[in-house]
C-alpha cells in the first residue's frame, strides 16, 4: 500500500495548481492531507468526492484554518474524528481511519510559535495524542501516523534552520 502525506497549506490553492492531475498520475492508495484550510461546505463536489477515492474530512471550526483529510481507494472499516477533547478537536487536527489490519492517522500538530500559551497547548496536544495512541496500542491496534508534526529533528528538516533556531519545535 502506497501512503502519501502532504501539508498542502490550503487545499483549494493546490487544486488550482494541479493537485488532481498529480493524484491521478501518481495513483497512491492513500493520501493524508494536513492544513486543508477549508470547511466541507465551502468545497466543490469534485474536491469533496475525488474520482476513485473515498474522502474523509475533519476541518477546523474556524474558517480558513487548520483541518485534515484522507483520500483512500480502499473503504475503511471505521472513521474517527479528533481525540475526543473539544479544545483540540475544534481545530480539526486529527483524523483516523480503521482498516482491518491497522489504523491510519492524518495529524496536523500545533506549531506553538505564537507565545507561551500556544506552546503549552502544543505540549498538551502531544501528551493527549500519545495517550490516545497508547490506548489504541493497548487494544492491539497497529498504527500508522502521518502528518505535519511541527517539530524538526535536524537542520535538514527545515527550509531555514538558522532563522528557526530559537523557535519551539527545533
Label the predicted regions:
Residues 12-25:
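Short, acidic/polar
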Residues 84-85, 110-126, 162-167:
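Surface-exposed cleft-lining segments at the edges of enzyme active sites
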Residues 40-42, 64-65, 113-116, 152-161:
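Short catalytic/ligand-binding loop motif for oxyanion handling, primarily in non-cytosolic enzymes
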Residues 1-9, 101-113, 146:
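Active-site-proximal beta-strand elements of phosphoester/diester hydrolases
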Residues 14-15, 89, 121-128, 170:
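Soluble or luminal CAZymes and related metallo-dependent hydrolases
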Residues 37-39, 44-112:
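Structured beta-strand-rich core segments of catalytic domains in phosphoester-bond hydrolases
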Residues 51-54, 127-170:
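Metal-dependent phosphoesterases centered on the DNase I-like endonuclease/exonuclease/phosphatase
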Residues 7, 23-41, 104, 133-155:
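Active-site beta-strand/loop signature of hydrolases that rely on acidic residues for catalysis
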